[in-house]
Amino acid sequence: MIKTIMSLFMALLTIVAITRAGPVRAEAKSDILAPALSLFLPGLDQWWEGEYRAAAAYTGIWVGGSSLAATAIDSLKRREVESGSEIGTDEGLASRDGDVRRAMLGGQMAFAAGSYSTLHAFQNAADSRRESGQYSFMGEQVTGKAAVLDTVAAPFRVSYLSRSSTYIPLGVIGALAAYSVKSKTPGYVNVALRDTDYAFGAGYSYLAGTHEEALFRGWMMPLIREYVAGDTTSNILQSLIFALAHRGSVDLPIPQLLLGYHLGYVTQRNGWTLGEAAFIHTWWDVIAFMAAYSKRESPAVLNLPPLSLVF
């Protein structure tokens, strides 16, 4: 779903950019095509620009993640053939099956590589266009490599917890998670968390929290801001797209819409840097995962009728 949305977004924005963009310097880099291609072929723009270390890193993560996912999917298929029944892949993120989790983690790694490569390409392109008057709203110039490194390191910066824009949303999700764990839900029972729950939840949350910020707030929102509308409108539009991209996992992504808007607001307030947003996003997901894994559907109970023997 998310790739379909991204393809439509890129097509529409390309049309808008062509019709509205003014003259740019000859050495200005592509802020739409190169980042877009790098999303689907991680490292492409970096190989082209001669940034070989970054290119190798993005391509390597992409290949490694894709291989992990493919191996896990093959294992799932073999097990299903041997058992003659489905493993339960429809549970998605709620599944505790090792192969299902490896498949999802590998897929997330591959997607993250594309988002990091996209941010890297876009940041360099935006900086190359500043002398033509574009992207002046983005604050001080940073290289694409620096932007990516800042984003992937952000979830470990606990200093963000001193900001009300960080501890309030995390406090809200924490309180809701605690209530969910302690309350009794019909059809569900509380279960102890396993080490694998912590490991998968943390790894998946880290990848989602960093690469989705790179994609939605690091590339999409400033593009909309430059070619379509101002700060508020660009934030609203990106948060709507962010929510729609999560329709595959939730029926009504209202929390994602609100979170996306807050993360966009924080990003704009911080000079269009992604650090605080990546911190909030990552730990929001960690808390949500741990709360979800603390409950499981009650096992089916077979109620047999009483046995009556009549002589």
Functional labels for PLM-detected ranges:
Residues A36-V81:
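N-terminal, post-signal-peptide region of Sec/Tat-exported proteins
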Residues G60-A72, V81-G88, N235, S239, ...:
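Short alpha-helical interface elements
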Residues L76-V100, P186-V191:
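Flexible, solvent-exposed loop segments that connect beta-strands
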Residues S205-L207:
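Detector for outer-membrane/organellar transmembrane beta-barrel domains
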